[in-house]
Amino acid sequence: MCFMTFFNGEKPILFPDITYSFYDVWAEEFRIPYETQPLDDDFNIRKEDYYKENGGVIFPNPNAPTGVEASQEMIEDILQHNQDVIVIIDEAYVDFGAETALPLLEKYDNLIVVQTFSKSRSMAGMRIGYAMASPELIKYLNDVKYSFNSYTMDQTALDLGVASIDDQAYFEETLHKIIQTRERVKLRLTELGFTFRDSKSNFIFASHKSCPAEELFEKLKEKDIYVRYFKKPRIDNYLRITIGTDAEMDEFLSEVEKYLKETGRL
């Protein structure tokens, strides 16, 4: 919806080269020119790359698939250098430990912060998402939504969304469990020889020092354990490991350890 509403000029929009996989899909679908900006070797945004003339900026924070968080200082710097275009911060995973950019809405009328119920509230099938921005930008979004919205919500979805917000205790308890498990898994992965950047999401983007990611991905798949492998430049030796229950993660870690020992890598 934001792409349709705000990214309709002749100048290219900017987003990272390693990012949510649908940004380029939407840009191509709506014939929006775009340029990807390379993250640095630690998967951080290089703010200077966004100083150039452009038709808009969008990036996820924390990043998907890396889980790396951009600081609020960096986000504000990008906003200061892009006050004539729309800047969208995609906070799909923000509840898992990252800092929201919402306070910056008071200072920047060109900022849009989007969030979703699909991740931290486990309601992907309900298709509930929302944007927060100045009244003027929300009006423009509504104008397009009432004409072209393909993600309409029925009363059941709306009722479930309200129930999710009302049960804040369960929401916070679930987040705490996921974060706690994530930190435990990170420690064990380090012991097993993996490296990764600090994740502020519900997944870990990890690479092993001697076991190729694709090889481990295929081995885990044989055991009906599914992690995400990206056969793309720069990240083709990483696995995105989503945090499940403690029992699921114990099984995952056990199979990884077993395979590393069998192949003489541990």
Please tell me what each predicted stretch does.
Residues M1-P12, S210:
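Phosphate-binding glycine-rich loop
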Residues K11, I32, N82-I86:
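A short helix->loop->beta-strand "cap" motif at the edges of active sites that frequently abuts
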Residues D17, T36-D40, Q115, F230-K231:
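Short beta->alpha connector loops at strand-helix junctions that form conserved
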Residues D40-D95:
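Active-site phosphate-binding strand-loop segment of PLP-dependent enzymes
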Residues E73, E218-K223, R228, K232-L266:
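PLP-dependent enzyme catalytic core of the Aspartate aminotransferase-like
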Residues N110-T190, F194-R197:
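PLP-dependent aminotransferase class I/II
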Residues I179, E191-K223, L239:
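Conserved PLP-binding catalytic core of the aspartate aminotransferase-like
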